Every structure is written in structure tokens, then in C-alpha cells.
């Protein structure tokens, strides 16, 4: 006999899909623009429909443990108002006006760069639909999608490196330049 636990539904607020099923996934990327691409530093599934602001503290501590680097600034969207992060002066919410310098304003524009990363994770790396069972499956799917995305960036970089190496070792013949 096969029994599957029903997925909890959330009110999505969209006309085409009034209810959403599944869990929230938290994605963390660097605030600065890396040369190799926008890597995913941390991905985790959050169950029970938590408030965004309450998820910030645990996610940042996990991120600091994984990378070994203390985060200096965190740029989040307006859903994180009322967060419980211990260092409130390091969290910058979209649309914030007070204490915003020019460099922070420039970094806040980079916050929008995480949206295409989420889109690629959903469309090309199977984060949009999970085929794994249970809460552990949700967590594993989020981590595996992020790892696949990062691996694709590494493969793209290696492909460019190999192309440059082959062009250096085997230059095109002179007659090919004049065709």
C-alpha cells in the first residue's frame, strides 16, 4: 500500500495560481559581482511556511559556518522587515533610505542579480519541481540544484580556459586569416 503525505498549501495571491504547494527555499549569493559568475553560496529548504524575517538569523549563521567568513552586509527584500538577526546594522532592506551611503546603494542594486539565479535554478536545475520524498528530499533537492548550478558555471569557465589554451598551442594558419 502506498500513502503519500499531502503537501501543505499556501495562499499565493496570484490569479493564475491561488495556492502554492511546497516549501520555501533560501538562496544566498555574494553581494559583489564575482568574475566567474554569480555562485550560490548557500541553499536550504525551510518548512512550515516561516516568516522571511525569522529565517535570516539561522541562514546567516549557517552561511558563516560554511564559508568561514563573517558577513559584512546582507541585502534582502522587503519581506525581511522585522528580522531577528543579531547584528541589525548589517542588514539592508530594499527601499531603505536611512544610513545608506553611495557604496551601499550600489550594492543594493546588485541585490536584484539573485533573481536570475533563482530563475535558472527553477528552470534548468530542477528546483521548480521536487521528485524527492519528504523534508530531507526537499533539503537535498535545494542543495543539489545549487551544486548543479555552480558546477555548470565551473564547466563554462573550464571550457573557456581550454579554448584559450588550444588557440595558444595551435594558432590558425596564416592563409585562414585572409579568406
Predicted regions and their residues:
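Polybasic low-complexity intrinsically disordered regions
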Residues: 1-72, 78, 85
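Composition- and surface-driven signal marking solvent-exposed, interaction-prone regions
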Residues: 41-45, 87-88, 132-135, 158-167
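A glycine-rich phosphate-binding loop feature that marks nucleotide/adenosyl-phosphate handling sites
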Residues: 1-3, 76-83, 136, 164-172
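A short, flexible helix-boundary coil/loop motif
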Residues: 124, 128-130, 152-179
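Helix-centered, glycine/charged polyanion-binding patches within enzymatic domains
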Residues: 64, 68-140
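Generic, well-ordered alpha-helical scaffold segments in large soluble proteins
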Residues: 30, 59-66, 117-120, 124, ...
Amino acid at each position: 500500500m502506498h500513502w503519500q503525505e499531502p503537501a501543505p498549501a499556501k495562499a499565493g495571491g496570484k490569479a493564475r495560481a491561488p495556492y502554492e504547494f511546497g516549501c520555501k527555499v533560501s538562496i544566498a549569493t555574494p553581494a559583489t559581482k564575482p568574475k566567474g559568475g554569480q555562485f550560490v553560496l548557500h541553499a536550504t529548504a525551510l518548512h512550515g511556511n516561516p516568516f522571511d524575517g525569522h529565517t535570516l538569523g539561522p541562514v546567516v549563521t549557517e552561511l558563516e559556518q560554511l564559508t568561514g567568513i563573517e558577513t559584512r552586509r546582507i541585502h534582502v527584500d522587503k519581506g525581511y522587515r522585522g528580522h531577528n538577526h543579531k547584528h541589525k546594522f548589517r542588514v539592508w532592506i530594499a527601499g531603505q533610505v536611512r544610513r545608506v551611503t553611495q557604496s551601499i546603494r550600489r550594492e543594493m542594486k546588485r541585490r536584484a542579480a539573485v533573481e536570475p539565479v533563482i530563475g535558472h535554478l527553477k528552470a534548468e536545475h530542477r528546483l521548480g519541481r521536487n521528485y524527492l520524498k519528504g523534508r530531507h528530499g526537499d533539503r537535498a533537492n535545494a542543495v543539489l540544484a545549487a551544486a548543479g548550478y555552480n558546477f555548470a558555471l565551473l564547466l563554462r569557465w573550464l571550457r573557456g580556459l581550454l579554448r584559450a589554451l588550444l588557440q595558444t598551442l595551435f594558432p590558425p594558419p596564416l592563409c585562414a586569416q585572409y579568406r
